Amino acid sequence: MSTSDQKRETIMKRSLLVLAMGVALSCTACAGGSDTDKVNGSISVSAGQPATDVSTVNGGVRIADNAQVKSANTVNGGITLGDGAQAAELDTVNGSITLGAKAAVSGTVETVNGGIRLANGADIKGKLSNVNGDINLDSAHIGGGIETTAADITINGSSKVEGGIHVQKPSGMNFGGSNKVPKIVIGPGATVTGALDFEREVELHVSDRATIGSVRGATVQKFSGDTP
């Protein structure tokens, strides 16, 4: 099965999961569900609360500075992990994901339609992935690589991405922005280990002070200074 087919299958499964979550969470709500398990409405987690799974269907998730959760999931809404906060995984369908300074995720970070931003010192042990939406790293770390279809990617400061970068070709499904040529910028001082693998046309700009692995499917455009 091709990577594009796998992505289609993943999103089909995700759509079914949305329906299942709606039914299950509706039943929970009828029974007086907790503030960390909703159908409609945003969720906020304060520091000092016991770490638990948090999920909603229609609403954002805000995890305060230095707070802890297990997984944080929503369907229609963004997720914010505050400065120094910790989570096992972050997952949304339609919404952005933001990690504050020194925030840490021990697993994966994934959105379908939404940007992802990592502040100084943020750390993701697993993979970071999306389909659409800009990906921005500012002196952050990713242990499991970056995967996208149509995102512009900017890797700045002392950021280190282990596991490479994989840009998939668009599938037959029409995701907004999939016809736009993604722009990949690896700035001065940044490091990407592993392969940079591009299945579609991209603009690949790499600082003469950056370190990268092997490149397949794109031509490196070197630049000096802070930006291309």
Question: Each predicted region: which residue ranges?
Answer:
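Intrinsically disordered, low-complexity terminal regions
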Residues: 1-228
